[in-house]
A protein has these predicted regions:
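Hydrophobic "lid/gating" helix adjacent to the active-site nucleophile
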Residues: 1-16
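Short, Gly/Ser/Thr-enriched beta-strand-loop segments that form substrate-interacting elements
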Residues: 81-87
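A common structural junction motif
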Residues: 53, 130-133
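Histidine-centered acyl-transfer/condensation active-site motif
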Residues: 21, 64-74, 91-128
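Active-site cores that bind ATP or allylic diphosphates and position pyrophosphate for catalysis
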Residues: 78
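A general secondary-structure signal for short beta-strands and their flanking turns/coil
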Residues: 11-13, 88, 104-106
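Helical lid/core segments from catalytic subdomains that handle acyl or acyl-like groups
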Residues: 20-75
Length: 133
């Protein structure tokens, strides 16, 4: 028998979730509404992350599809493993330190998709389009 609490949701807007180190040395998360206007996005990012750091409180945007991100700049990584729950079924993007070579610099990233958003073939197509652009 199917669980009737599950439903497919469509959102009109998205947000980017970031982790913020707060003034007490702990962490909080902060959802930043996405905007095509990079200046507006930057203003929102600076304001909301500053508030989260100063107030030591997390903020979330329940009415938006939230894409999780995490910077793990203290380490090099090739992939991330994330445990999905019924509460957090959003896509995730993580990155580590830059890798500097003789002729190029690379930033390894790890995308994770939940089957709620896309199947494996769709994720592979998205990543291939990202790679060639």
């Amino acid at each position: 028998m199917a669980d009737s609490s599950w439903r497919l949701m469509q959102y009109d807007s998205i947000a980017i979730n970031v982790i913020v180190e707060n003034k007490k040395g702990g962490i909080n998360f902060c959802d930043i509404p996405y905007s095509d206007d990079i200046q507006k996005f930057n203003e929102d990012y600076l304001r909301l992350t500053s508030e989260a750091a100063a107030e030591c409180e997390s903020s979330s945007l329940e009415n938006m599809m939230v894409v999780g991100t995490s910077a793990m700049i203290g380490t090099e990584l090739d992939s991330i493993v994330n445990q999905y729950t019924d509460k957090f079924c959003n896509p995730m993007l993580m990155w580590g330190s830059y890798r500097c070579g003789l002729f190029r610099t690379a930033l390894p990233i790890s995308f994770q998709f939940h089957h709620v958003q896309m199947d494996g073939s769709h994720a592979a197509r998205f990543l291939e389009l990202l790679r060639v652009t």
